[in-house]
Amino acid sequence: SGYSGAALDFPVAPSLAGHYSLTNCGQPSGASKCAEGTVPQAAFEKGTCYRELYASSCHHEETQIFQYPAV
C-alpha cells in the first residue's frame, strides 16, 4: 500500500509499524532504532527499542528489544 521502495527500508515512525520494505528478500536486515516516549496523561514506559527485521522469502519478522535506563 505505497510502502515499497529502497528509500523506505527502515521507517521508525510508530504509524509505519508493520509497513517495512526490504530490498533484499531472504537476507537478514540491519537493526533500526526508535525512541519510545511518553504521551500526555498516559502511562507509557520510557525507553529505547531496537527493531530487528528478518526477511525470509519476503516474509518479514520483527523482534523488538527494549532497553530501559537504570533508575
From Swiss-Prot:
GO terms for cellular component: chloroplast thylakoid membrane; phycobilisome. GO terms for biological process: photosynthesis. It is found in: Plastid, Chloroplast thylakoid membrane. Signal peptide: none annotated. Phycourobilin 3 binds at residue 58. Phycourobilin 2 binds at residue 34. Keywords: Antenna complex, Bile pigment, Chloroplast, Chromophore, Electron transport, Membrane, Photosynthesis, Phycobilisome, Plastid, Thylakoid, Transport. Heteromer of 6 alpha, 6 beta and 1 gamma chains. This is R-phycoerythrin gamma-1 chain, chloroplastic. It comes from Gastroclonium coulteri (Red alga).
